[in-house]
């Protein structure tokens, strides 16, 4: 599709989103578009420091977990001494960027709003680690904490998964992996999904949206996919193209959030409509005037904080509902 035919989303954003797009951090260099991936990772970490500031204070603990691929670092956020459930968080970043620090504020706010222990998983990034390593590392982390719950004062009878963007795919894929492989790490009471991609190769929204402002052009999306997958056959795997999995049964309750001008919004719409058609518990909410990744910007956007609180409320409601 010719770029000129795309919707001019920058003229349609909310005032809050526009303020974020126009915000310039003092002393921050331009994005290293032609830099190597490690340079881009360091830039992303530097750029996110401002957005992670002024986060709620709470007890945190770092735990290095052994997995079949080697050690994986996790961070436990405990807003109170005891917790009614444990929520595992998978960060976004196109499978190639991000870590526990780039999403620290998001996890702290989720812990505060749910009152539960949130465990961030610093899964191995692509292209150094290819599908399905991040999923298998996540499952190994869940298994570890289910076996060491007392040591960390965790309640693992009720667990959940959460993630944004690529992390949302990993969150849902990990829950389906547990179901499909008959691995028990606790009762998965909910999955919180913010603007994820779930396997579509093309869609109306991917044609109409996406540009330099969000790093989600068609070329960008192809690059992320090629970095993550081992080969083209993986595109059809039921834990990458989640629409090739069985979504008609035993899918944990899903909170599905999308951004209005996100090229990935059709993934969320299709996921919601599929689950709804098969009577799988789910809730869908679109946040008007927003771009992909808006969850990061709660320091300037009340709607980002609203989206986190909406997910937290969904999770807390499922804590009280027997499954």
UniProtKB/Swiss-Prot annotation:
GO cellular component: cytoplasm
Short sequence motif named Involved in the stabilization of the negatively charged intermediate by the formation of the oxyanion hole, residue ranges: 91-93
Keywords, ordered alphabetically: Cytoplasm, Hydrolase, Serine esterase
Active site: 165, 262, 292
EC number: 3.1.1.-
Broad class of the protein's primary localization: cytoplasm
Keyword Ubl conjugation listed: no
Residues in the signal sequence: none
Family: Belongs to the 'GDXG' lipolytic enzyme family.
The protein's role, per its UniProt record: Displays esterase activity towards short chain fatty esters (acyl chain length of up to 8 carbons). Able to hydrolyze triacetylglycerol (triacetin) and tributyrylglycerol (tributyrin), but not trioleylglycerol (triolein) or cholesterol oleate. Negatively regulates MalT activity by antagonizing maltotriose binding. Inhibits MelA galactosidase activity.
PANTHER family: AB HYDROLASE SUPERFAMILY PROTEIN C4A8.06C, ALPHA_BETA HYDROLASE FOLD-3 DOMAIN-CONTAINING PROTEIN-RELATED
Assembly information from the UniProt record: Homodimer. Interacts with MalT and MelA.
Cited NCBIfam families: PRK10162.1
The protein, known as: Acetyl esterase
Organism name: Salmonella paratyphi B (strain ATCC BAA-1250 / SPB7)
Taxonomy of the source species: Bacteria, Pseudomonadati, Pseudomonadota, Gammaproteobacteria, Enterobacterales
């Amino acid at each position: 599709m010719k770029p000129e035919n795309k919707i001019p989303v920058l003229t349609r954003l909310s005032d809050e989103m526009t303020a974020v797009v126009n915000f310039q951090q003092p002393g921050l260099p331009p994005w290293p578009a032609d830099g190597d991936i490690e340079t881009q990772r360091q830039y992303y970490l530097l750029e996110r420091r401002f957005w992670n500031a002024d986060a709620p204070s709470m007890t945190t603990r770092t735990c290095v977990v052994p997995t079949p691929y080697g050690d994986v670092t996790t961070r436990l956020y405990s807003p109170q001494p005891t917790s009614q459930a444990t929520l595992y968080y998978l960060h976004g970043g196109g499978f190639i960027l991000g870590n526990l620090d780039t999403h620290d504020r998001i996890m702290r706010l989720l812990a505060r709003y749910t009152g539960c222990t949130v465990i961030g998983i610093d899964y191995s990034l692509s292209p150094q680690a290819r599908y399905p390593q991040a999923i298998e590392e996540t499952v190994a982390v869940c298994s570890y904490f289910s076996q060491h719950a007392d040591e960390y004062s965790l309640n693992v009878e009720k667990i959940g998964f959460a993630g944004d963007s690529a992390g949302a795919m990993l969150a849902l894929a990990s829950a389906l992996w547990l179901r499909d492989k008959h691995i028990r790490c606790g009762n998965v009471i909910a999955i919180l999904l913010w603007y994820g991609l779930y396997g579509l190769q093309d869609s109306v929204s991917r044609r109409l949206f996406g540009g330099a402002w969000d790093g989600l052009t068609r070329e960008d999306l192809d690059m992320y996919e090629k970095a993550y997958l081992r080969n083209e056959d993986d595109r059809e795997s039921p834990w990458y193209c989640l629409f090739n999995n069985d979504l008609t049964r035993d899918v944990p309750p899903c909170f599905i959030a999308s951004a209005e001008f996100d090229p990935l919004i059709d993934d969320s719409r299709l996921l919601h409509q599929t689950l709804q058609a098969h009577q799988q518990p789910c809730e869908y909410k679109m946040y008007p005037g927003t771009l992909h990744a808006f969850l990061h910007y709660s320091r300037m956007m009340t709607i980002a904080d609203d989206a986190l609180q909406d997910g937290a409320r969904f999770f807390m409601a499922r804590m009280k509902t027997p499954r």
